[in-house]
């Protein structure tokens, strides 16, 4: 990069590099549009410096919206923090247009503060911190109507201007699909000297309509050379609180996550049921991982596999 990027720069990794409307008049336009010249985004060095004390990063992905990815992110974080009290965990909500983590983590109404090292993330527990664009809005009902370049710029700020401190694991709650946000965060966090430090977990429900998009997400990770820890099947069954019988609310017509994992050679980390207690806790921001139930039993196995993948 020969000159500072314009405000709405699509990024050198984007297919729109040198072609977008923001590129008109930029001194770098000719360089960015040349496929034979590999460029390094100047923001990458800032991210590397800011994240130097973050040991591992875990992308929580799903191709389909509404499969409970944000809920799973909060549950994993809570359980990991409770079962590993000597480790530090962070959550970065990069679903810019639909931030859910402030509510799920019981931090609605909190705000971030500026320190000498950048934005200070919101403390959730002694060993858990959270950053989300939700903390920067005047109202929880405010709509964020941004194009890709502006969202990418916000993600770059979250990675380079937040004082994360020493973290053993940073979990990133991502939007559905394989959009600009995914390309940006991967380009900033991939470390060729330590490729195992960035990994991914897929979240799906048993229906084929969800599995179809998760397959695309898996192929995205393979193309980007991101190791996949495994797949979590969410909402796999519902256990009645009165009779104790289990029902499949979303039947696995094509074999569910287990069949897909076998087909694509990806580990199945476990399955999480539909749980009324968890549903209520998500709305109130409570932490229910301290209680023993079918969900926390499943989380125990899933979280142990995740931690083992980074050891």
From Swiss-Prot:
Keywords from the named record: 4Fe-4S, ATP-binding, Cytoplasm, Iron, Iron-sulfur, Metal-binding, Nucleotide-binding
Keyword match Transcription regulation: no
Pfam families reported in the protein's UniProt record: ParA
GO MF annotation: an example: metal ion binding
Disulfide bridge map: none
InterPro entries: Mrp/NBP35_ATP-bd, NUBP1/Nbp35, P-loop_NTPase, YlxH/NBP35
Binding site for [4Fe-4S] cluster 2: 240, 243
Localisation per UniProt entry: Cytoplasm
Main location: cytoplasm
Origin: domain of life: Eukaryota
Cofactor(s) required, per the database record: [4Fe-4S] cluster
CDD domains with a match to the protein in the record: Mrp_NBP35
Note on how the cofactor is bound: Binds 4 [4Fe-4S] clusters per heterotetramer. Contains two stable clusters in the N-termini of Nubp1 and two labile, bridging clusters between subunits of the Nubp1-Nubp2 heterotetramer.
Protein family: Belongs to the Mrp/NBP35 ATP-binding proteins family. NUBP1/NBP35 subfamily.
Function recorded in the entry: Component of the cytosolic iron-sulfur (Fe/S) protein assembly (CIA) machinery. Required for maturation of extramitochondrial Fe-S proteins. The Nubp1-Nubp2 heterotetramer forms a Fe-S scaffold complex, mediating the de novo assembly of an Fe-S cluster and its transfer to target apoproteins.
Quaternary structure note: Heterotetramer of 2 Nubp1 and 2 Nubp2 chains.
UniProt-listed PANTHER family: CYTOSOLIC FE-S CLUSTER ASSEMBLY FACTOR NUBP1 (PTHR23264:SF35), NUCLEOTIDE-BINDING PROTEIN NBP35 YEAST -RELATED (PTHR23264)
Protein name, per record: Cytosolic Fe-S cluster assembly factor Nubp1 homolog
Originating organism: Drosophila yakuba (Fruit fly)
Lineage summary: Eukaryota, Metazoa, Ecdysozoa, Arthropoda, Hexapoda
